[in-house]
């Protein structure tokens, strides 16, 4: 899918403009935590969403996709549990993580489960392979690197397990682990609810750490070399430039710039690989998932923006859904709206993780126990 368009940001008040490498960027904003409510609890409906939020996230863009349909065929009556992780591999197959048929996140869904949480499908949804039972407490996101290796972040903690990142080959053999099993902390060899991995073209490994909501929780990016040797870290809990509040998702563009979905701050922050700040984008909504394809088409899933009172998930004027644009200049061209009402509840709905296949069809991994495929019209 080719996107040719200019940056489309609406800015108000005293929001500043940065012009960075020919890119117009909007500055500002905030995020929610996963609810323990059941999937049947939809967000409460409020008023109709406006054309755009104060931070520039548009709700009135064209939607070139058919309505999402449930996707993925399991044997033996198994059904999707909560999920936030899905990725396309170099061969076009789709990899996903499943929290072992259970509902919720950051819990102990897979601890003691006989189910495999790492799953490979073809694009029709046929299950090709699964593995990983007994390894995870609560898998969060999955990444496929350019060599086809798989990276899974486990942000659960139970009985001496969890709080690690695993690297697998496609047969499920463990090639590397990062972090200490069952240990959560701020050290250079520990994580506190790691969320996702991104692998640079040279093999350097970047881990978003972490998902914690406490004031002293980790909120940083950790960098390792291709062998797992720690190199550096940057970021802390906060709202300033280079600070994070739930760095929830990572992606690289073709220039090797690192995109960090700083979810609780309702923004994407962009850095070079040494942690130097490049830009801040708020026009894509509240980023639960970010995927960038080889043509620098960027797909951003917003599963939590809400109206109502300030607090977790508060992002007034921004409707949930998938925004699609250009990673080169930050322009947003398309919007696939979440079918849930424009609500005041912080419950997650719609895609929390996403990827796209080679023709541009989208696969959205949902906290509410499903994966949906969105086919281009």
Show which residues each predicted segment covers.
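Bacterial lipoprotein signal-peptidase II cleavage site
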Residues: 29-32
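Short terminal (N- or C-terminal) low-complexity/amphipathic segments
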Residues: 6, 26-27
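Bacterial N-terminal signal peptides
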Residues: 12-26
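Bacterial N-terminal signal peptides that target proteins for export
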Residues: 2-15
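Eukaryotic scaffold repeat domains enriched in small/polar residues
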Residues: 13, 34-377
